[in-house]
Amino acid sequence: MDSIGENILEKGLLLLGVELDQSQVKVLLAYLRLLEKWNQHYNLTAIKNSKEMISKHVLDSLSIESYLEGRRILDVGSGAGLPGIPLAIARPGCEFVLLDSNAKKTRFLFQASVELGLPNISVVSERVEVYRPSHLFDTIIARAFAKLVDFVAQAEHLCKPRGCLLAMKGRFPQDELEALPASFEIVKACSLSVPEINAQRHLVKLRPRRAGDH
């Protein structure tokens, strides 16, 4: 990752309003270099261009940083560590669990957490619907889950009673929102502006309804 890439990243962070110190920026760049290296052999992401990785992976991940709640965060289907690793770098005071059922991907996630020196990351190789942690989560994130109704059905047992689910989507998922069960309320469904990305990006924030909520 050259100085041009570093400039693109720093400019993007400024536009997103995400404040990181120089050491955090260096860890983000080290993550991208590691991802490029592993991607040559393990096909972790279809994006090969380093400049595209900055925008479509790192900046896209950090576009939801301000929506995180609490200290205990779960990244469902983390894959190559997106959005979990960039968010863990930005939020060192939070505890992140990166969950993926693909052993090849969890090997990369574990290696990345060690090489990047990220003690706030734990990696779990498990399917979300059978994952049973000892403690529930304040925020559960999914970046590439097929449908909202499936995300809710498979992850709701992991959410604290007043926690939230964050679903990162492309186009506005109107049909998916209408199909959601009454047990969850839609807190927010908004567009995201990600530097260097022209495609539509949206975020849906959901919360479990309490008894008596209407």
UniProtKB/Swiss-Prot annotation:
Catalytic activity: guanosine(527) in 16S rRNA + S-adenosyl-L-methionine = N(7)-methylguanosine(527) in 16S rRNA + S-adenosyl-L-homocysteine
Residue numbers binding S-adenosyl-L-methionine: G77, L82, V128, E129, R143
Documented EC number(s): 2.1.1.170
Family: Belongs to the methyltransferase superfamily. RNA methyltransferase RsmG family.
InterPro entries xref list: rRNA_ssu_MeTfrase_G (IPR003682), SAM-dependent_MTases_sf (IPR029063)
Annotated GO CC locations: cytosol
Pfam families associated with the record: GidB
Signal peptide from the UniProt entry: none
Places the protein is found: Cytoplasm
Physiological role: Specifically methylates the N7 position of guanine in position 527 of 16S rRNA.
UniProt keyword terms in alphabetical order: Cytoplasm, Methyltransferase, rRNA processing, S-adenosyl-L-methionine, Transferase
Record-given protein name: Ribosomal RNA small subunit methyltransferase G
UniProt GO MF annotations: rRNA (guanine-N7-)-methyltransferase activity
